[in-house]
From Swiss-Prot:
Start and end residues of each S1 motif domain: 627-695
The protein's required cofactors: Mg(2+)
Protein name, entry field: Polyribonucleotide nucleotidyltransferase
Documented EC number(s): 2.7.7.8
Catalytic activity annotation: RNA(n+1) + phosphate = RNA(n) + a ribonucleoside 5'-diphosphate
Domain of life: Bacteria
Family the entry assigns: Belongs to the polyribonucleotide nucleotidyltransferase family.
Cellular localisation: Cytoplasm
Organism: Erythrobacter litoralis (strain HTCC2594)
One of the GO biological process terms: RNA processing
Gene3D superfamilies associated with the record: GHMP Kinase, N-terminal domain (3.30.230.70), K Homology domain, type 1 (3.30.1370.10), Nucleic acid-binding proteins (2.40.50.140)
HAMAP family: PNPase
Positions with biased composition (Basic and acidic residues): 707-729, 745-754
């Protein structure tokens, strides 16, 4: 029934298996990839015809993680997978970026690539497996895919060794310094995505080359599978030679476009380019009705002519669109503290690209909860990137987070996270928000620069400031030019988008997307060297605005004080069912968080509230000291005295005889529940029971008073007791309405009465004879 084909290789200490022919057989191409015990199914389907009027390549990639893959049931009301998570969106982009350039120009059939994680072993990251499965499925589908590609994750240990396919946790753990993902063909690197702990250019380039070498093994396995199971290739219309038509078009609008691309102002340049395009449409208007296909074909050549004019000007004359040198960075203006009520803010402007970045500091309960295959986890650092349509002078959808915004935000996140302080040093939740207000290239790197400044303005003690730059490439044969700080048009018309961010110590993030084959190690080395000089220049401009983090957090930010208690005291601070900790929060107004190690974080924007909560907690965990005076509150009144809460979480008994020096008939004559009193600790018995006294403390000042009560005389042999000799019968007599018998002949001082028939069974042990 099944014509199953399988290829397996040993790779990175595990077996990688690619299977086809058993599952999803109606798709154009379907591959089940297994690595370790992580299994990903990728299915590829394509439309057989192009939609009318289609003038772009509609490739859509969907990556989905099934909770069942990790033996979990999704949360929420519906208990099923919902909209794509951030990780799923980023992995979809990770697959899309190296695959898209490998389809021929002019191929506009719609393609769906769907990758689903079916099993996850908790160690093998499924994103790499999904990239390999997608490449294999496209390769055997018969589509005009100029692959295959391989993919690999690389780590870099403290010992200076590269590691193939570490888990994400290990890659950036205590012994890890790098999380780098590479996608490549047999001959060239196509895509790089990474986060690093301030590594050098040489170390980063070495990791890329290591990943490329390892990915070739995967490419070999995919080719072996294709030799067994590949479908017949699609028949494509022969590519028409349009060089003659291009030269005719150059004669119509070539001069207009050349002049337009020398205008430095983006809006004015765009107007001039649009005027040239309109001129082309008018020139070929006679074809619009007689030969619509030819008419559309001629108009598509306008974009190719634009690219040709810009690229030749850069390669031959070294002339960029805005007149800069190839290694020149646009003018930079940076300022901080522009928004009065935010915790930190910065405005970063580079040419016609601008970002307003704000930093907000929160407490532990503001951490982001992430529910994925690995289970619940929490992140105390967030970076959100917004790209409103007005930033490019357009009308468009607002308020919806696009895949591009998610990807750009994550790139800036990776660039800044390595320089954040440890949570023990700075126990805040940090949210950086970047709103792009103008855009003409490299807005994600403006977010890195602005985000770094806004965090320093908020008082976040960064290890070092971080700057970022976007590099470009124009490649024609063996001739190439690397461009620093590219414009939007240079990005669209060029061959590479190469973003580098880092501190003065090294690179923290590297992202590369290549649109053509032939990017050599020499080109990447040149780009990294040029980027290093550009980053240093930008960092200098940032330092002029703010050289280092402010000494303290904003006055509008919450204060967080950390204290450590013994683990055995945690339950005392929390109380039964959380009663004590809730009372602390309710009474003081401060937030209190406590972890399993006994680390307590107290937060509030009011220093007095923090101090009140701290003292309360100290009172709970502190041991009572005999002879010391404390503030307390009456929490319960009984016949023989009152229980007083002191030191926040301790109760002690003030016997009726210790309320005043003179005789007290009833405790309620002296105190009432909720009353604030001052007490002295007289005794703590072996069971921790505390005996307190009010009579030796001035209730106004809290000062200790001299004990004027004469000492009690020795009682000697007390003999038989009248009036109900059985002590359990009670001896209250008529003096306290106790209903017991006699005993009235003895003056027993403060121990008289008050048991209401209960006898000494109600008296604490340390008060009994």
């Amino acid at each position: 029934m099944f014509d199953k084909k399988t290829v397996s290789i040993e790779w990175g200490g595990k077996t990688l298996t690619l299977e086809t022919g058993q599952i999803a057989r109606q798709a154009d191409g379907a591959v089940l990839a297994t690595y370790g015990e992580t299994v990903v199914l990728c299915a590829v389907t394509a439309a057989r015809s192009v939609k009318e009027g289609q003038d772009f390549f509609p490739l859509t990639v969907h990556y989905q993680e099934k909770f069942s893959a990790a033996g979990r049931i999704p949360g929420g009301f519906f208990k099923r997978e919902g909209r794509a998570t951030e990780k799923e969106t980023l992995t979809s982009r990770l697959i899309d970026r190296p695959v898209r350039p490998l389809f021929p120009e002019g191929f506009y059939n719609e393609i769906n690539v769907i990758a689903q994680v079916l099993s996850y072993d908790g160690e093998t990251e499924p994103d790499i497996v999904a990239m390999i499965a997608a490449s294999a499925a496209l390769t055997i589908s018969g589509l005009p895919f100029m692959g295959p590609i391989g993919a690999a994750r690389v780590g870099f240990t403290n010992d200076g060794e590269y590691v193939l396919n570490p888990s994400v946790v290990d890659a950036l753990g205590e012994d890890g310094n790098l999380d780098l993902v590479v996608a490549a063909t047999q001959d060239a690197v196509m895509m790089v995505e990474s986060e690093a702990k301030e590594l050098t250019e040489e170390q980063m380039l070495g990791a890329v080359m290591f990943a490329h070498e390892e990915s070739r093994k995967v490419i070999g396995a995919i080719i072996d599978l294709a030799e067994q199971a590949a479908k017949d290739p699609w028949e494509l219309d022969p590519v028409e030679d349009k060089s003659a038509a291009l030269e005719k078009l150059r004669g119509v609008i070539g001069d207009d476009l050349a002049k337009a691309y020398k205008i430095t102002n983006k809006a004015q340049r765009q107007d001039a380019v649009n005027a040239a395009r309109t001129k082309a449409r008018e020139h070929y208007s006679d074809l619009e009705e007689s030969d619509p296909a030819e008419y559309m074909g001629r108009l598509k050549l306008v974009k190719k002519l634009e690219s040709d004019i810009v690229r030749k000007a850069i390669l031959k004359d070294g002339q960029r669109i805005d007149g800069r040198k190839t290694d020149e960075v646009r003018p930079i203006e940076a300022m901080v503290g522009l928004l009065p009520r935010t915790h930190g803010s910065a405005l970063f402007t580079r040419g016609e690209t601008q970002a307003i970045c704000t930093t907000t500091l929160g407490t532990k309960d503001s951490e982001q909860m992430i529910d994925g295959l690995e289970g619940l986890s929490y992140s105390n650092f967030m970076l959100h990137y917004n790209f409103p349509p007005y930033s490019v002078g357009e009308v468009g959808r607002f308020g919806f987070t696009s895949r591009r915004e998610t990807g750009h935000g994550k790139l800036a996140f990776r660039a800044l996270r390595p320089v954040l302080p440890d949570n023990e040093e700075f126990p805040y939740t940090i949210r950086v928000l970047s709103d792009i207000t103008e855009s003409n290239g490299s807005s994600s790197m403006a977010t890195v620069c602005g985000g770094s400044l806004s965090m320093m303005d908020a008082g976040v003690p960064l290890k070092r400031p971080v700057s970022g730059i976007a590099m470009g490439l124009i490649l024609e044969g063996d001739d190439f030019t690397v461009l620093s700080d590219i414009l939007g048009d240079e990005d669209h018309l060029g061959d590479m988008d190469f973003k580098v961010a880092g501190s003065e110590e090294g690179i923290t993030s590297l992202q590369m997307d290549i649109k053509v084959a032939g990017i050599t190690q020499e080109i990447m080395t040149k780009a990294l060297e040029q980027a290093k000089a550009g980053r240093a220049h930008i960092l200098g401009k940032m330092t002029e605005a703010l050289g280092s983090s402010r000494g303290e957090v904003s006055k509008h930010a919450p204060r967080i004080e950390t204290m450590q208690i013994d683990k055995s005291k945690i339950r005392d601070v929390i109380g039964t069912g959380g009663k004590v900790i809730r009372e602390i929060v309710a009474e003081t107004g401060a937030k209190v968080d406590i972890d399993d190690e006994g680390v307590i974080k107290i937060s509030s924007s009011n220093a007095d509230e923090i101090e009140a909560a701290r003292k309360w907690i100290e009172g709970i965990v502190e041991e009572a000291e005999v002879g010391k005076i404390y503030n307390g509150k009456v929490v319960n009144i009984v016949d023989f005295g009152a229980f007083v809460n002191f030191m926040g979480g301790k109760d002690g008994l003030v016997h009726v005889s210790e309320m005043k020096n003179e005789r007290v008939e009833k405790p309620t004559d002296v105190v009432s529940e909720g009353q604030e009193v001052k007490v002295k600790v007289l005794e703590i018995d072996q069971r921790g029971k505390v005996r307190l006294s009010m009579r030796v403390v001035d209730q106004e000042t809290g000062e200790e008073l001299e004990d004027t009560r004469p000492p009690r005389e020795p009682r000697g042999d007390r003999g038989p007791r009248s009036g109900g000799g059985d002590r359990r019968g009670g001896r209250g007599g008529p003096r306290r309405g106790g209903g017991g018998g006699g005993g009235g002949g003895r003056d027993r001082g403060g121990r008289d009465g008050g048991n209401d028939g209960g006898g000494e069974a109600h008296v604490p042990d340390f008060l009994k004879d």
